A protein has these predicted regions:
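Helix-to-loop junction immediately C-terminal to a conserved catalytic motif
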Residues: 4-36
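Short, basic, glycine/proline-bearing loop/turn elements
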Residues: 5-6, 77-83, 109-112
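A generic structural signal for well-ordered alpha-helical segments
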Residues: 8-10, 76, 98, 130
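Short gly/ser/thr-rich secondary-structure transition/capping motifs
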Residues: 11-18, 86-89, 148-149
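Residue-level signal for beta-strand positions within conserved beta-sheet cores that form or flank
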Residues: 13, 55-56, 161-163
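Generic preference for hydrophobic
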Residues: 17, 32, 59-60, 165-167
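Catalytic core of membrane glycerolipid acyltransferases/transacylases, capturing the structured
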Residues: 25-87
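Non-catalytic C-terminal accessory region of glycerolipid acyltransferases
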Residues: 89-193
Length: 193
């Protein structure tokens, strides 16, 4: 899976990666929180993660689209190690269970892909997961995927479009901090990238 994914990324896109040092030194599970502009986002994120973390990372995706047909659900589970989440933004028991078993979880808290390439408001799921599970959040900024593979496209545009991904330093909720208090910190960290 990963070899194929990396080959597709290398052949179809020009991907620039920043911020992996903090990620390599982080032990244990984390919630990776990224903006979401294209179906490419998951592939770019997974293909750039260090192998040790990637092997124990699952991706939360909207269940009402990807899990409505057995073909899409099987393909996404095999290619990207996915599990369903609610579009309304509530964290799932599956995500909390994965974190409890030492897995990292990718969350796109906008709830859906951007319609115009700009970041949408974040829902509370990532903050709730981090606070409830007491794990760090790794903010992730992804740029260029909307232009490389806009809505309605099934493959990246020709010409190896440029895409950038930046991993920010891990952030932890403060002791006693609520998800509502922690959420703006996450949003600001992702926007900054």
């Amino acid at each position: 899976q990963v070899v194929g994914l990396k080959n597709v990324m290398r052949n179809e896109l020009s991907v620039e990666v920043h911020g992996l040092d903090d990620l390599r030194h982080l032990a244990g599970p984390a919630v990776l929180v990224a903006n979401h502009a294209s179906h490419l986002d998951t592939a770019v994120l997974l293909s750039t993660l260090p192998a040790k973390r990637r092997r124990r990372t699952a991706v939360g995706i909207v269940g009402d689209y990807f899990f409505e047909s057995w073909l899409r659900s099987g393909a996404s589970a095999i290619a990207f190690n996915t599990f369903p989440i609610e579009q309304k933004g509530a964290p799932t028991r599956t995500a909390a269970d994965l974190l409890g078993r030492g897995w990292s979880v990718v969350v796109f808290p906008e709830g859906t892909r951007s319609r115009d390439g700009f970041m949408r408001p974040f829902q509370m799921n990532a903050a709730q997961l981090a606070v409830q599970s007491q794990v760090p959040v790794i903010p992730v900024g992804i740029r260029g995927t909307y232009a490389a593979m806009p809505r309605g496209s099934y493959w990246p545009l020709a010409g190896r479009p440029r895409v950038g991904i930046r991993y920010g330093p891990p952030i932890l909720p403060r002791p006693g901090e609520t998800p509502q208090e922690f959420a703006p910190t996450i949003v600001a960290a992702v926007k900054q990238l």
